Amino acid sequence: MLRSLLLPAMACLMFSPPPEPVDLAVRNVRIVHGDGRVTPRATLTVRRGRIAAISPGEVRAGVRPGRDVDGAGCTLIPGLIDAHVHVTDWALPLLLRHGVTTVRDLHNAPGYILPLAREEAANRPRILAAGALLDGPGSFWKDARIISTVADARAAVRDQVAGGAAVIMVYTRLPLALIGAVVQEARARGTPVAAHLGRATAVGAARAGVSSIEHLSGIADAASDAPGRLLAAHDHFVGGWTMAEREWARLDPARLDEVARALRAGGVVLVPTLALHEAFSRLADPDLLRDPALAGVPARVLDREWDPKDIMSRAGWTPDTMRDFKAALPVLQRFVAGYVRMGGRVVAGTDTPQQFVVPGASLHRELQLYVAGGLTAAAAIKAATADAADLLGISDHVGTIDAGKEADLVLLEADPIADISATSRIRLVIRGGSIAYER
């Protein structure tokens, strides 16, 4: 009798499947998926660098994780994307430590950035790069690729794409006709075009087909009652930025709405870099150098390149300029929120490591500025995850938390939907399925 009772139990043991090994499990965690979905409590497992499963409650029976993380009270978000950077070696570890697992580099030495972008590495962010930017004669940047004709534009795009560029960046001294030629050639090769505008308005560039407009450039020019004056000012790089920035505080809100509607109709994505706009407005602030985020910046960089008085002197900026820049910032913020409300897309970017735009920390500040301007926290997170991945053409494998996607994840100590500043309260950063940073 005892034997007959034991036989079924022994059979179950003999034929039960072995425990399913996974590399990592995060249990009992709230998941903000990046596209607006929220799962209040779940367990996520990772295997071979990808999200294996998302299950309600505890780890599924039969799953044996190599590393088991209790996520109770925490929130898991997708790895963050900064869609406007200029990579340096010292910036990469800072970016990853702040949860930035992907970056789009929009100008750098091609011999440095393009080979780096080809190398997949779990100890730094994924890089999609433009190589050298394309600009007209007299460019502010000595390493820009100079184009003067339509033939130049087409050849430059062919060369950039052949060299591995994932995006083409056009700059301030290019007129609309040459921007259009760049877009046409890039489109034939399935490559997007980003634009920092100077000699073309944002509306013109959107109609020409650029994928994204950086820094909200060309918008003040399009909304101004004297656009020719602003367009001409961009012949001097800093002078053009200064005049456009000051113009924002004077613009008619109704005219800005018209421009926003035209941009939305053109389907262009805005990459506002509000953290950069704010950083420039704070150069005369006495507490600027006391920002705790500066602790991550090498002393040699702070001493040589980040002296606020020296920056203002070289740019010809005065305390009055700073006041005008501060007055412009809330107008920029409201424009961003309004653009999203009318159905336009905004993607988070910072221009780090521009002075006082600290790698990683500045992206969290970018999101805070969006929310302070009227965007919801969920929309701000989407701008740095799902929408950013879509702009970069990588939404099939990153940008949201879904089974099968790459395990680029950030575990937060609080809920960023309730308080956007929680994106900076990082407990773990997971890059390609491996824990890259742990507080």
Label each residue range with its predicted role:
Residues I31-T43, P56-G57, V358, T376-I381, ...:
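Acidic, glycine-enriched loop/beta-strand segments at the rims
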Residues L5-D23:
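Bacterial Sec-dependent signal peptides at the C-terminal "C-region" and cleavage site
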Residues L92-L114, P125-L133, A162-L174, P192, ...:
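Divalent metal-dependent hydrolysis catalytic cores, especially in the metallo-beta-lactamase
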